[in-house]
Amino acid sequence: MRRLLSPLFAALIVGVTVLTAPSTSWAYPFWAQQNYDSPREATGKIVCANCHLAQKLTQAEVPQSVLPDSVFKAVVKIPYDTSVPEIGADGSEVPLQVGAVVMLPDGFTLAPQDRWTDDIKEETEGVYFSEYSDDQPNVILVGPIPGDQHQEIVFPVLSPDPATDSNIHFGKYSIHVGGNRGRGQVYPTGEKSNNTVFTAPSTGTVRSIEAGENGASVVTIASADGTELSETVPVGPALIVSVGDAVEAGAPITNDPNVGGFGQLDTEVVLQNPVRIYGLLAFFAAVALAQIMLVLKKKQFEKVQAAEGV
């Protein structure tokens, strides 16, 4: 029941926020959740990159190894210059939001809150986690949340226990991480947002630039054969052409207002067998004891030699 309510609650939060704050700059892992069965394509690309076209650095920190049934932190870092705003849906300057997705190995899940340490509770304050879907509890989403407060997002992760799940085995596992800052350039419907470059629809001369609806500009280009095509530029991007300018098809007619972007990476974690650790510790103890015995034996031998006057 809790898993069912989590995505519904996330949808309610996003829906209310969209209606009440249309000018805010969003990073929407939620949209990927609604449009793709899996957040990762067969090629390895995380689907967020289909809407967030700019590539930006994303980093991740996870322990090298973890024990079964233990809670550890997977930290996703989404660095960017917080002093630079971007263009909101209404054309105003707004601070960037961030979002992240962590695809854990099968069996690894978001740790239950009753197992969070005080440090984890403090580090995750203001962060809401949701599972990608009911049948993928190992895929965890965060966002959108204010980027200036969350350039590092801590994911509390619970490791599985092979002793209670026969499908889980000790060994090395891959973790896929994606991090985004700012709005996308394309909506899931395929339409451009106002956070991207607009280009000339044909080769020709800019015949007119007229005001459109909601602050948009309609740029009309006349081809050499007299054909006219128009491109509607929404409020936000700045025009870089004027009436009478010659343009090539596909050439930019606006600046690029986007300052955000998406990045992904793969990392690894080892689910360590505690018996091997105990065996290793016992081996180290045996080696240390053997060295001590050798030292004591050597000193005893030296004393005997000294007593015999050798």
Swiss-Prot record:
Identify the InterPro entries for this entry.
Cyt-f_TM, Cyt_f, Cyt_f_lg_dom, Cyt_f_lg_dom_sf, Rudment_hybrid_motif
Q: What keyword terms does UniProt attach to this protein? A: Electron transport, Heme, Iron, Membrane, Metal-binding, Photosynthesis, Signal, Thylakoid, Transmembrane, Transmembrane helix, Transport
Compartments reported by the entry: Cellular thylakoid membrane
Needed cofactors, names only, are: heme
What start and end residues bound the annotated signal peptide? 1-27
**Transmembrane feature ranges:** 277-297
User: GO CC annotations?
Assistant: plasma membrane-derived thylakoid membrane
Any one GO biological process:
photosynthesis
Q: How is the cofactor bound?
A: Binds 1 heme group covalently.
One MF term in the entry's GO annotations: electron transfer activity
Q: Where does heme bind?
A: Y28, C48, C51, H52
Q: How does it sit in the membrane?
A: Single-pass membrane protein
Asked if the keyword DNA damage belongs to this entry, the reply reads no
Q: Which family does it belong to?
A: Belongs to the cytochrome f family.
- How is this protein organized at the quaternary level? The 4 large subunits of the cytochrome b6-f complex are cytochrome b6, subunit IV (17 kDa polypeptide, PetD), cytochrome f and the Rieske protein, while the 4 small subunits are PetG, PetL, PetM and PetN. The complex functions as a dimer.
Q: What does this protein do?
A: Component of the cytochrome b6-f complex, which mediates electron transfer between photosystem II (PSII) and photosystem I (PSI), cyclic electron flow around PSI, and state transitions.
The name this protein goes by in its record = Cytochrome f
Q: Which source organism?
A: Synechococcus sp. (strain WH7803)
State which gene encodes it. petA
